[in-house]
């Protein structure tokens, strides 16, 4: 269980939460299949294991792992449009009259309801870790929309969830640009070989560099011309590598082999033990990594009144 992406949310109040109360709350919003006329469903499912008795909360030390599943029927717009056009053409030809918007919308709704039971179903899961001792919720996603879907459903289950996206005092683009300009990152962070540069003008250009020497004259000329670094690949403390963007999304997380080997050793032969060991080691690593990252980016911004 290693997160591949990371969106960080700050709890703005102490969250009085234990495994039993969280398990009970999530049980009120379980994942379930789409009914024949439903476009989508969303709810919580067991992060590890299957079956009705699998717990919805996995606990390790004082960290909680949860998982939400979205199920949606895929009904391509082109299929609906073609069916609607065929129906409208048929009515206009047979009844010698024009079909106007109100009737067209009604026909579209009828077509959707007819096609829905035969539509393909797509399922996707999103994991999140709740760390009350750190005051953080960590979502394994690079999509803010997916993270907000999980958090809003968690808020409904708990009744309230005082949380906001984490922010820092200095604009991330300014810090990332400075690191590439000076060819040195702060603390135990190291600049790797990938970045995205954007012009500050609205219609300005974008340069994406992969497997390139970011200390090269070519890159420095782009920075001198006014481009800002909006994504940068970094390594931290010989433990993990990642890409950080200007929205503080951590993408393409990769934990170094030493950590993964340690998790395999700690987990033993049992599959659940392996998952638990990797989750625990990941969270203990995040407990060191995230404060170091916030500090390197100029410190966490705490909005007034929070």
From Swiss-Prot:
Subcellular location field: Cytoplasm, Nucleoid
Per its record, what are the GO molecular function terms?
Answer: double-stranded DNA binding
Q: What keywords would UniProt list here? A: Cytoplasm, DNA recombination
Presence of the UniProt keyword Translocase in the record? no
Please give the chief subcellular localization of this protein: cytoplasm
**Annotated Gene Ontology cellular component terms:** bacterial nucleoid; cytoplasm
Kindly list the biological process annotations in GO that this record carries.
Answer: DNA recombination; regulation of DNA recombination
Superkingdom assignment: Bacteria
What is the role of this chain?
Answer: May be involved in recombination.
The UniProt entry's sequence similarity note says: Belongs to the RdgC family.
Question: NCBIfam families under this entry?
Answer: PRK00321.1-2 (NF001461), PRK00321.1-3 (NF001462), PRK00321.1-5 (NF001464)
From the Swiss-Prot or TrEMBL record, give the protein name: Recombination-associated protein RdgC
Q: Which organism is it from?
A: Pseudomonas aeruginosa (strain LESB58)
Lineage runs: Bacteria, Pseudomonadati, Pseudomonadota, Gammaproteobacteria, Pseudomonadales
């Amino acid at each position: 269980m290693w997160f591949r992406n990371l969106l960080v949310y700050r709890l703005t109040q102490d969250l009085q939460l234990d495994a039993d109360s969280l398990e009970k709350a999530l049980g009120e919003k379980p994942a379930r299949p789409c009914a024949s006329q439903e476009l989508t469903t969303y709810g919580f499912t067991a992060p590890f294991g299957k079956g009705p008795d699998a717990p919805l909360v996995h606990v390790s030390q004082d960290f909680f792992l949860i998982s939400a599943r979205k199920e949606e029927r895929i009904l391509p717009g082109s299929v609906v449009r073609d069916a609607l056009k065929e129906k409208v053409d048929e009515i206009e030809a047979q009844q010698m009259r024009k079909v106007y918007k109100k009737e067209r919308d009604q026909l579209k709704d009828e077509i959707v309801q007819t096609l829905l039971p035969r539509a393909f179903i797509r399922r996707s899961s999103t994991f999140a870790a709740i760390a009350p001792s750190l005051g953080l919720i960590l979502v394994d996603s690079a999509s803010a929309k997916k993270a907000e879907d999980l958090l809003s459903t968690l808020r409904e289950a708990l009744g309230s969830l005082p949380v906001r996206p984490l922010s820092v005092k200095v604009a991330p683009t300014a810090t990332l640009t400075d690191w590439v300009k000076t060819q040195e990152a702060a603390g135990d962070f190291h600049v790797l070989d990938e970045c995205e540069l954007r012009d500050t003008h609205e219609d300005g250009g974008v340069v994406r560099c992969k497997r390139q020497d970011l200390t090269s004259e070519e890159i420095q000329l782009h920075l001198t011309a006014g481009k800002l670094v909006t994504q940068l690949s970094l390594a931290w403390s010989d433990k993990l590598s990642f890409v950080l963007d200007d929205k503080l999304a951590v993408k393409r997380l990769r934990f170094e082999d030493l950590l993964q080997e340690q998790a395999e050793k700690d987990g033993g032969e049992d599959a659940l033990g392996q998952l638990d060991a990797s989750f625990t080691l990941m969270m203990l690593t995040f407990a060191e990594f995230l404060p170091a990252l916030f500090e390197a980016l100029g410190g966490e911004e705490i909005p007034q009144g929070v």
